Amino acid sequence: MTALSKKWLTGLITGALMAVSAGTLAAEQKTLHIYNWSDYIAPDTLANFTKETGIKVVYDVFDSNEVLEGKLMAGSTGYDLVVPSSQFLERQSQAGIFQPIDKSKLPNYKNLDPEMLKLVAQNDHDNKYGIPYMMVTTGIGYNVDKVKAALGKDAPVNSWDLILKSENLEKLKSCGVSFLDAPSEIYAAVLHYLGKDPNSSDPKDYTGAANDLLLKLRPSIRYFHSSQYINDLANGDICVSIGWSGDILQAANRAKEAKNGVNIAYTIPKEGAMVYFDMFAIPKDAKNTDEAYQFLNYLLRPDVVANISNHVYYANANKAATPLLSAEVRDNPGIYPPADVRAKLFTQSVLSPKIDRVVTRSWTKVKTGK
């Protein structure tokens, strides 16, 4: 064999080995598919997880429980971890959508607060199907200066009257009003405000006074959306919104960082409000369950979840993480409500299919104003 032939053969073998190695590495690349809410994780969480484990994360986002539920009910989502709210997880687990959580694969499960687990168990019995991620209250976000200008210094900013009393909302219309596009939560808030059971199983409660009030308010509501209000509050494009605690506090922080003179505040109304947890769960048809458990155990580390809470302004269920929270988060009553406020919070039970259909039809009428 000539020197040239040897050189050619060596090059051919080297190239083939490199191709095989590259193919092997590609085959060994582990992947995890996550479907989470928008604006709901720290900027470095996923990159740090990949750096530590070598697992590539494909991360998609949604902004309503209804969107997530539609995908889950259709089946074959392709996701290994999803994040329903606890009241939706209850219904979905009854439908056989999730795998039970194998706690033996989660050494860091011990970090969870027993009191928080007890709260979650109202929807996820025996804490069987979900891992609590962040605690959410549904309250009111408002532009301090614009609301004061519209309603005066005695504006009822600590009450549902601010946004559910038609004469107040009419005065706020010009500076912009938004509601969550979350029918079950809005109806629960309105029913509670009207002195009715927020978990009512009577269809007339949804088609009667609650619906009448929402239709009366409708002309003053600019839009229904479950994420747009964050930036709109921060930019001063709207002045009041029914929204989620951490989202509104993120808006306040964005305005502060932008130094745009917009002062946003969050209130849990004195009459009481809904509280629940968003939960990580593993769909029954998940293909990468080992990777899912690695990610869940990673999230249960105090340093990891504290970093997330410090960025998204939501309370977590990890007792060991509390000392690592920033004072801005830990001492904020809108994030970690004091005992007297917690006493007035209520959870939401799973809606029956019949009530769910009534709510969907009624909500469509409200959104269209008909």
Residue spans for each PLM region:
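N-terminal signal peptide c-region/cleavage motif recognized by signal peptidases
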Residues: 21-22
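Early extracytoplasmic/lumenal segment of secretory-pathway proteins
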Residues: 27-92
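Paired acidic/hydrophobic, glycine-rich loop segments that form the ligand-binding mouth/hinge
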Residues: 79-84, 222, 239-244
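A ligand-binding cleft/hinge motif common to bilobed small-molecule-binding domains
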Residues: 88-91, 240-260
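Extracytoplasmic ligand-binding site segments that recognize negatively charged/polar headgroups
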Residues: 89, 93-220, 227, 232-234
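Periplasmic-binding protein-like
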Residues: 207-216, 222, 260-281
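Conserved C-terminal helix/tail region of periplasmic/extracytoplasmic solute-binding proteins
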Residues: 231, 339-370
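Mature extracytoplasmic/periplasmic domains
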Residues: 278, 283-344
